[in-house]
Structure formats: C-alpha cells, structure tokens
Amino acid sequence: MDRIHITGGTPLNGTIPISGAKNAALPLMIASLLTGETLELINVPRLADIAALTRILGNHGVDHMVVGKRPGQTAETGQTVRLTASNVIDTTAPYELVSTMRASFWVIAPLLARFGEAKVSLPGGCAIGTRPVDLLIMALEKLGAEIEIDGGYVVAKTKNGLRGAEITFPTVTVGGTHVALMAAALAYGTTVIDNAAREPEVVDLAECLSKMGARIEGAGTSRIVVEGVARLGGARHEVLPDRIETGTYAMAVAMTGGDVSLVNTRTELLASALDVLASTGTEITALPDGIRVRRNGGGISPADVTTDPFPGFPTDLQAQFMALMTLAKGQSRIRETIFENRFMHVQELARLGARIRLDGDLAVVEGVERLKGAPVMATDLRASVSLVIGALAAEGETQINRVYHLDRGFEALEAKLGRCGARIERVRA
C-alpha cells in the first residue's frame, strides 16, 4: 500500500492549477446515460473515483474515449472525455462496482428515466456516517417510480414513464437534487424541486443538461423547475473548477506561509470559506483566472466555523480548516452539521501534537506553538488531505499511510505541491 512522506517546515511558493471538480464530474458523467448521443466533458480530473465510475458506466455499455486535455493544465491533469451511451446493454449496477464509490448509486436516475427500469446496489464510498439514500428514493417515488429493496439492491420500475411532480426535500441533499434533476429531465410534465441544493456542482449539472436539451429554471436557488422533454441529445461541456481543491491549497498556504497563485478557479465558488480564511490573517487577492493566497509572517488568528450547505462553509473543508486551526494563536470552535462521525481525523492530528477536544458535533481546537512529524493514517478523503496540510507545517518527517483515499479526490497532489517547494514523496508499495 502506497505511503506519502512529507518533511515539513517549508513555505509554499509558486502556482497551482486547479483541476476540474470531482463532485461535478461524477454526476455529469452519469448524465451521459440520459442520451444515445455523445457527451463530451472537458477538464475531467484523473482520479480513482473517476476511473471507478468509468468502469461502472462501461458495465452498462457506455463507450468511453479520452481525446485530449484542457489547455493550461499539466501533463498529468485535465483530460477531455467522450461518453456515448448508444448501446446500453444492462440496467443493473452490481455490488462489486457500486460498493467502491457512493455517487455511483445515482445511475439509478438516468437508467430509470430513459429505460423504465434500474437495479442498483446500495452504495459504498467514504465511511462518514450513514448517509442514507432514502431521500433519493423518495424523489424517484414522487415521480412515479415503483421501488423495492431486494437483497441489497434498489429495484426501480416505471410502467408508463416518470411523471412530473412536486418534490420537497426535508433537508438539503446534493445527491437527491442531482437524482431529481436527471430523472425529471425525461419525465412527462413539470417537476418542482423545493429545498433543492444550491451547490455550484448542482448548477453545473443543470447547465450541462440544458445544453443537452433539458428545460430547467432556478438552478442555484432552493426552488428548481424542470419541464420534462421526450429526449435529450449530445453536448460539449467543461467541468467547473474544484472549489474544495482550491480551498485545500489555500489553507495549506495559510498554514505553511508563502505566496501561491491558484489558477483555473473562481472566487465565487468559495466566498464563505475565503472570508473565513481571510479572518485568520491570510491575504486573499482575486486574480483574472483565480486567486492569490499569501501569508508572509504573523501568527494564525483563530476563527469559529459551522459547516452548512452552500453558500455556507463546506463540510468538505472542515478537516482542512481544523488542521489550520491547530497552529492558531488561541481557541477555535468547529461545528459539523452536515455529517455525523466526520471527526475521524482528530486522533491522527493529535499524533502530530494537535490539541482538540470533541463534544458531539463540536470540535474545540486549542492552538499549539508547533506540530511535530509522526506516522499517521488516513481515514477518509478529506481527513487524509488534512494530514497532508498538517505535515507540511510540522517539524520533521510525517509518514501518511492509506493514501488511496487521497487518490480518490486530489489529482496530482504531490506534483502540484512539489512544484511549490513542498518536500513530499510517494513511496510505492
């Protein structure tokens, strides 16, 4: 099993190109099942989760072709892919494939909408709480699907196609909104999605579906209206920049010091997180094609955050921000409201010398003067990168084990950090 070795204490300086967002690319790839024509996606990151979904789509008969890369990206990043679902041979998504990645469950929506049936295994992915699929199933049932759970599979059928309906989510759900959008695009009549997720990745999916011929209004608000159409066609669409990767590298610079330009990204994708970061004493400057992050001396000021759906502070940056706060000059309080059991990184940060106390959904971080390198173990995707950030600022060497979690969500991480001066090396098993 691969490990990453980091020798900390070096400020980051240089330029980091931000990859396409994994959390946008996954539903976009799944949307290829809605049409028999070709969907071309630009700026798709090279990640383990993307490869896993490619295998799942291939199992259904989707043809996948890599045709190039996004201009401005490095050799190891930013691929352009063409997906063609003209010969779907199977509407079953088996356990051995779906269990590797939670988002793959979303294939149930386009399969059901286009073919009238789907059999999809209950999902896997990061082990952060239960994250049930109940809301996704509820949305499909509202649209007229007949659903049963049989042997660990969700079996969905519709006799005469899906029909528009009013869907009100009791809590904000990104996955549920993705599923509702894809299913409603081919449903008969009008679908209204209330309490819809407002995340940029939802907007990106809606924009791509619109290019394919869908009729969608209100994406980016809490109320989305979809007028179903009889068929969707092919399209060409660029995946939006990864706001979580942007925030992660910004926090790495804030923690280690230095001056880094994050390019191929947009400030509006991360407004709340950048505001919080600025309050810690980090200088944030907008660039024409990204942001510049600087911290050249002075301590890190403590700050309190509560994770919330967009436009609030992202849960996917909670672990990274906690790593930053371990060196703050004072106490900070971090409340996690999106997922339960998302503090698994705490005990590993403690191995580096962090002082963190947990009380339910609240983490109280007492800043320390310094961290010291130690062997640590990644527990999930975002927790693993928080250990990278901590290790970059720690004295001495840190060995991070189980880094396959990193490969699920961070494209060319060692190369990007290494070009900015980080002393980071992957040791192959």
Curated annotation (Swiss-Prot):
InterPro entries: Enolpyruvate_Tfrase_dom (IPR001986), Enolpyruvate_Tfrase_sf (IPR036968), MurA_subfamily (IPR050068), RNA3'P_cycl/enolpyr_Trfase_a/b (IPR013792), UDP_GlcNAc_COvinyl_MurA (IPR005750). One of its GO terms (biological process) is cell division. It catalyses: phosphoenolpyruvate + UDP-N-acetyl-alpha-D-glucosamine = UDP-N-acetyl-3-O-(1-carboxyvinyl)-alpha-D-glucosamine + phosphate. The gene is murA. It comes from the Bacteria. The active site is at C126 (proton donor). Cell wall formation. Adds enolpyruvyl to UDP-N-acetylglucosamine. The modification 2-(S-cysteinyl)pyruvic acid O-phosphothioketal is found at C126. Pfam families: EPSP_synthase. Pathway: Cell wall biogenesis; peptidoglycan biosynthesis. The keyword Metal-binding does not apply. This is UDP-N-acetylglucosamine 1-carboxyvinyltransferase. Belongs to the EPSP synthase family. MurA subfamily. It is found in: Cytoplasm. GO terms for molecular function: UDP-N-acetylglucosamine 1-carboxyvinyltransferase activity. GO terms for cellular component: cytoplasm. It comes from Methylorubrum populi (strain ATCC BAA-705 / NCIMB 13946 / BJ001) (Methylobacterium populi).
